[in-house]
């Protein structure tokens, strides 16, 4: 009974974590680009 819920939570968390990492990396890149100029 718990396995489908757990798999759903994992499948829901993976894209969110990937999106968060991508956004933070993008913001750091933007900040570094502004500092370099």
Swiss-Prot record:
SUPFAM superfamilies: PetG subunit of the cytochrome b6f complex. It is a single-pass membrane protein. Pfam families: PetG (PF02529). Component of the cytochrome b6-f complex, which mediates electron transfer between photosystem II (PSII) and photosystem I (PSI), cyclic electron flow around PSI, and state transitions. PetG is required for either the stability or assembly of the cytochrome b6-f complex. Belongs to the PetG family. The 4 large subunits of the cytochrome b6-f complex are cytochrome b6, subunit IV (17 kDa polypeptide, PetD), cytochrome f and the Rieske protein, while the 4 small subunits are PetG, PetL, PetM and PetN. The complex functions as a dimer. This is Cytochrome b6-f complex subunit 5. One of its GO terms (molecular function) is electron transporter, transferring electrons within cytochrome b6/f complex of photosystem II activity. HAMAP family: Cytb6_f_PetG (MF_00432). GO terms for cellular component: chloroplast thylakoid membrane; cytochrome b6f complex. It is found in: Plastid, Chloroplast thylakoid membrane. Keywords: Chloroplast, Electron transport, Membrane, Photosynthesis, Plastid, Thylakoid, Transmembrane, Transmembrane helix, Transport. The chain crosses the membrane at residues 5-25. It comes from Chlorokybus atmophyticus. GO terms for biological process: cytochrome complex assembly; photosynthesis.
């Amino acid at each position: 009974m718990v396995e489908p819920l757990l798999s759903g939570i994992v499948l829901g968390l993976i894209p969110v974590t990937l999106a968060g990492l991508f956004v933070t990396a993008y913001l750091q890149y933007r900040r570094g680009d502004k500092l370099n100029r």
